[in-house]
């Protein structure tokens, strides 16, 4: 079976049950994800899309779901790389039976970086607080997400984030890094910042 579907199949927790049924119903599943803006074959789409291919229904073999990275520009369809997502569901150590996000991995180097990030048990969310120091974050940024020490401008996409005072500078630098952007591209929708 081959489908062209909304790219939310990868990042939305609402589709966790759908991904479970896909992983359990077929031997091999491939999801390629494309941005609507610069991928020529989808340039008139109103949302970014994924191509999902499912093979060998009701097979005893269950290899899970393989994903590409999210393509910003049209790739050669014959050279798309995929990686198995089974051990990279988010939150860490989730299964398809639980509420999760599916990563858009693609090339092996992305898997290597994820392995290093997921090796550690510390979570950035542990330094967030309901009071303390405040930074400002831009929660929507098609190509970048930013953190600021002062509110840069008025927008519905600029929000305060409270952080333990000792970690304000650290979190500001982290959220302005390409590593943070990498994480959001892997697990997010490519436009809005995940809060988990």
Question: What name fits each language-model region?
Answer:
Residues 142-146, 184-187:
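Short amphipathic beta-strand starts and helix->beta connectors
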